[in-house]
From Swiss-Prot:
InterPro entries: LuxE
Keywords: ATP-binding, Ligase, Luminescence, Nucleotide-binding
Gene transcribed to yield this protein: luxE
Pathway field: Lipid metabolism; fatty acid reduction for biolumincescence
The protein's name: Long-chain-fatty-acid--luciferin-component ligase
EC number of this enzyme: 6.2.1.19
Any Gene Ontology biological process: bioluminescence
GO-annotated molecular function: ATP binding; long-chain fatty acid--protein ligase activity
Phylogenetic classification of the source organism: Bacteria, Pseudomonadati, Pseudomonadota, Gammaproteobacteria, Enterobacterales
Pfam families per the UniProt record, alphabetical: LuxE (PF04443)
Coiled-coil stretches: none
UniProt superkingdom: Bacteria
Length: 116
């Protein structure tokens, strides 16, 4: 049988890559999975807070700084923001993928995905 899928080996280059591509998630107990999830989400929040001025201002307007300790305290942009603003945490040449909405209401959202 011929495979039409181009396969490639992915090398884990970060803690999250290791979890996604290398680890067996069922080896960790649920509590351990939640601990890892919390750490990675808070790390990502702090990265975006530090490197995206618009997001930092949004957080500050909601009286949130980068010292939060709970995921539920992370302010989330309304999805409509991505229809009208180009938000970047890194340089455009570091963007790995652009995700685009269907544009059902006539205007498509574009969300960049950098390495983090």
């Amino acid at each position: 049988m011929t495979s039409y899928v181009d396969k490639q080996e992915i090398t884990a280059s970060s803690e999250i890559d290791d979890l996604i591509f290398s680890s067996d998630p069922l080896v960790c107990a649920y509590d351990e999975q939640e601990k890892i999830r919390k750490k990675l989400v808070l790390d990502a929040f702090r990265h975006h807070y530090k490197h995206c001025q618009e997001y930092r201002h949004y957080c500050q307007a909601h009286k949130v700084d980068d010292n939060i300790t709970e995921i539920d305290d992370i302010p989330v942009f309304p999805t409509s923001v991505f229809k009208f603003t180009r938000l970047l945490t890194s340089n455009e040449n570091e963007i790995e993928s652009w995700f685009t909405s269907s544009g059902t209401n006539g205007l498509k959202s574009q969300v960049p995905r950098d390495r983090l």
